[in-house]
Curated annotation (Swiss-Prot):
Protein name from the UniProt record: GTP-binding protein RAD
Residues binding GTP, per UniProt: 97-104, 201-204
Cellular-component GO terms for this entry: plasma membrane; T-tubule
Gene: Rrad
Record's compositionally biased regions (Gly residues): 1-13
Purpose: May regulate basal voltage-dependent L-type Ca(2+) currents and be required for beta-adrenergic augmentation of Ca(2+) influx in cardiomyocytes, thereby regulating increases in heart rate and contractile force. May play an important role in cardiac antiarrhythmia via the strong suppression of voltage-dependent L-type Ca(2+) currents. Regulates voltage-gated L-type calcium channel subunit alpha-1C trafficking to the cell membrane. Inhibits cardiac hypertrophy through the calmodulin-dependent kinase II (CaMKII) pathway. Inhibits phosphorylation and activation of CAMK2D.
Membrane-spanning ranges: none
A molecular-function term among this protein's GO annotations: calmodulin binding
Amino acid sequence: MTLNGGSGAGGSRSAGRERDRRRGSTPWGPAPPLHRRSMPVDERDLQAALTPGSLAATAAGTRTQGQRLDWPEGSSDSLSSGDSGSEDGVYKVHAAGAPGVGKSALARIFGGVEDGPEAEAAGHTYDRSITVDGEEASLMVYDIWEQDGGCWLPGHCMAMGDAYVIVYSITDKGSFEKASELRVQLRARRQTDVPIILVGNKSDLVRSREVSVDEGRACAEVFDCKFIETSAALHHNVQALFEGVVRQIRLRRDSKEDNARRQAGTRRRESLGKKAKLFLGRIVARNSRKMAFLAKSKSCHDLSVL
């Protein structure tokens, strides 16, 4: 990753030395200055803040001014769009999942604030401009799923957003089942083909694993979404996750054949309710290892294709 900045020959030489020094390290590096927004925690304040149109106005506010983040050029190609994006030019992404699965950690890594007082002061939304496949995109990640401790906010979150990241912990089978339930609820609320990515976090805890990779892929196949495993602790696949979010949004908005594909898929698919009952019944069975053979892969792990 390189940061665009500096001026004149001195700035170029400094930037070159900085790139050489980082070349063998994590591609994320220090984040540029961020525009952070704290979300209210009282339900009445939330309702006032998230009334129709106000959230879009918030997202359209002043974003990072200063250095622009360029991610590595080696990312895989996908369809790209020059002007594609939400109406205000910002892709809104919601992180959802059971408590303790690491969705806040993933959001903070994306936002560039992880530890110390800065993380506490960052609030619950993170916006950042990233370059994916040679084109810049602005993402706003909302980590507000559990703030009010009730059902109003998750319901509201399901009604808006350009993409959803549903996170579970590979060390907690219960969080995996919760992620499956959220997927069903989300599709029932959002009839449009909004991108949904199932994320198995904490992949570094190999000895404590309760959910296999095959189970995660099978779940994504059954519920028609994408799948990726990450480790917030090691920063593994976090960049790939958010780049994949951008690609999935672009692919759906740029594809001329999307409507025909969706209509054909609707005729083939069973009802989500039946699928949910069938799947949840299988994952509690002792022979859950056989789940990998129940569905053929359709590249659910490849976030650069539909």
